[in-house]
Amino acid sequence: AVCQKSAAVVKDYDTSEVLNRKIAEYALAVVKDKPSFHISFIMNVSPNCDCWNHNDAAIVPDLGIAASFDPVALDCACADLVKAAPSLVGNAISDKDSVQTCTCGHHHHKGEDKFRLVHPDTNWEAGVEYGEKIGLGTRSYELVKI
């Protein structure tokens, strides 16, 4: 990775599945047997990691803030919200297949995995699947809009 603090390093032999599982293990080590509450700001969703010194325009409109005591459920809910949202124009996924532009100024990749549209070889789901398996949380959630 390009993290300036070298907190996340991907070895050449690591796959995205391995990296995402490691992230779940590290998260479990931090929260195990401790009270925790998690908040995600689903805003300025960029196509690349926030730690990069450069990035592209947001891929979806700002979707709001989500919170949960369960980090796995929170990640799943946030990913599902991004998948359900229309994609914005002028970014890394604007020219991808199956795009439909409408008069509202959005491209519609609704329901598509926008993270895979940007990075087809990345399997982000491996992290939440493994997180559930090791007891970090559950992929089931109830979305309550306020």
Where are these regions (language model features)?
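Extended, low-polarity segments enriched in aliphatic/aromatic residues
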Residues: 1-146
